[in-house]
Regions:
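Conserved HGGG/HGGXW glycine-rich cap/lid loop of the alpha/beta-hydrolase fold
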Residues: 2-41
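Active-site nucleophile elbow and catalytic-triad environment of alpha/beta-hydrolase enzymes
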Residues: 133-153
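Flexible "cap/lid" loop of the alpha/beta hydrolase fold
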Residues: 76-111, 115, 145, 166, ...
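Conserved loop-alpha-helix segment in the C-terminal half of the alpha/beta-hydrolase fold
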Residues: 161-186, 193, 205-206
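Gly/Ala-rich beta-loop-alpha elbow adjacent to hydrolase catalytic centers
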Residues: 61-66, 70
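Short beta-strand/loop motif that positions the catalytic acidic residue
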Residues: 157-159
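Active-site loop/oxyanion-hole signature of alpha/beta-hydrolase fold enzymes
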Residues: 30-59, 95-96
Length: 207
């Protein structure tokens, strides 16, 4: 049995990992899904990491923007799932051309304006029922500065090959350039919604 700590990305919360957590629990693992204060202005990935706390005995998974957080967390293994990796120029280079549709409020927090836009921009490979359910729970995301390292040897990148947000080629090239292990998953940006069983099998293989 292993302990998994699943760290969400922008706009989401620990709720997004519900089905994945059930699958991992069925494998006999312990799972934590913390909620980060993504709406609070002025925080950094270091603040998020302090809220999660050191996890020296856990496999810590960061999805999407959560990759910048887990880089700062002591862990048995760090796993980057369709994630922004803590390297130079991440915001300029990581995203798929044309990704977007979110807007910003007067404080600079980004949000998805309606369910149709979220379905097209964030969840194109999800069912409409899945995307509507997720949209109803999304929060606003305060600006978050990019951070670098540590990243590389001992880390695992689960590259989501049909990702419409974080470019899969960038995920793979960046991981290889820094000596991280690459596992390719034929999935979109949110496989915890679309392929929770298959994703749990990948994580179980790391336990």
């Amino acid at each position: 049995m292993a302990r998994f700590v699943l760290v969400h990305g922008a706009w989401h919360g620990g709720w997004c990992f519900g089905r994945l957590a059930e699958e991992l629990t069925a494998h006999g693992h312990e799972v934590a899904t913390p909620d980060l204060p993504c709406e609070e202005i002025g925080l950094t990935p270091f603040d998020y990491a302090r809220l999660v706390g050191p996890q020296p005995d856990a496999i810590v998974v960061g999805h999407s923007l959560g990759g910048l957080t887990i880089a700062q967390i002591e862990a048995r293994v760090r796993v980057y799932l369709g994630a922004l990796l803590p390297v130079e120029n991440v915001y300029a280079e990581a995203f798929v051309d044309g990704f977007g549709g979110f807007t910003r409020d007067h404080d600079g927090r980004s949000y998805w304006p309606d369910a149709d836009t979220a379905a097209a921009g964030m969840y194109p490979d999800c069912s409409r029922a899945q995307s509507d359910w997720a949209f109803a729970q999304l929060r606003r995301q305060a600006p978050l500065d990019a951070v670098t390292g540590p990243f590389g040897d001992g880390d695992v990148v689960v590259a989501t090959l049909r990702d419409g947000a974080v470019d899969s080629g960038w995920q793979i090239r960046t991981a290889q350039a820094h000596g991280a292990r690459v596992i390719e998953l034929d999935a979109g940006h949110s496989p915890f919604f679309t392929q929770p069983g298959e994703l749990a099998d990948v994580f179980n293989s790391l336990a």
